[in-house]
Amino acid sequence: MKRINKTAEDQFLINFKAQNPNGTWDEFRNHEQGILYKRLKQHICNDQMYLCAYCEIDLDRENEHEIKVEHFKSKSGSLPGGSNWHLEWSNLLAVCLGGTNTGDDFELPANLSCDSYKSHYEDKNKINDKDWTGKILLPLTLPDAHNFFTFEKVTGKLLPNESYCNTISIDGKPAAETLSIVTKTIEVLNLNCSRLNNARRKLLFHFNNCARERNLRKLHNLLLQWNQGEPKFFQTTRDIIIRDDRICQGLLNGTIRY
């Protein structure tokens, strides 16, 4: 999960909220035949460089039906008289389908993730307070560069980076709570489902194949592809692989040359 820097809210959303202060998300989606909804979704995706806000898989630029708009504070928990989570710009994230499109390849709901699993988690655990701020990581408030995660290279599972978590406060919470917030993030979004674990292992396999060739120039070129420009799918996993490898660090900081 990487930081998301949202740009300014679209004026058409501001106008809709002014005219419909209690408007629902469905009402906005259907407003003007859905044209404004599609524009808003594209804006959100552009801010995220077409990566899922939670698991970081690529979002399909050519098929907007493969992309959902997620409400970090689940809109079903928005109460009358309070802030309208349905239309709150800072509450809107672009996410993948969370495994709902994998057919029979993976057992469900065990292999749901992201907002698809969050919704399942809320129902299963009868969650009433659906404001997840300060309970799980919010991509909008993450540090620009962070090391909240590591991962098991055998299983592909994400793990909290405990020593780092204990030094960083997040969302106004003391650093002593960060480890539990990161742990809860993995749980609520099901970031360790087999489907995502397998994808991380595949990325590591690709790296290991390149590293085994002992061609430092080729490895350096791979690292530059991973480490420069816009974030790529599973960028957090790429960053962890680079961070944990001495040769990678040496190639990037210039202490190892070829």
Curated annotation (Swiss-Prot):
GO biological process: defense response to virus
UniProt-recorded name of the protein: Retron Ec83 putative HNH endonuclease
Keywords, ordered alphabetically: Antiviral defense, Endonuclease, Hydrolase, Nuclease
InterPro entries for the chain: HNH78-like
Keyword Nuclease: yes
Function: Putative HNH endonuclease component of antiviral defense system retron Ec83, composed of a non-coding RNA (ncRNA), a reverse transcriptase (RT), a probable ATPase and this protein. Expression of retron Ec78 confers protection against bacteriophage T2, T4 and T6. At multiplicity of infection (MOI) of 0.02 cultures slow growth when infected with T4 but do not collapse, at MOI 2 cultures enter growth stasis.
Domain of life: Bacteria
GO molecular function, a single term: endonuclease activity
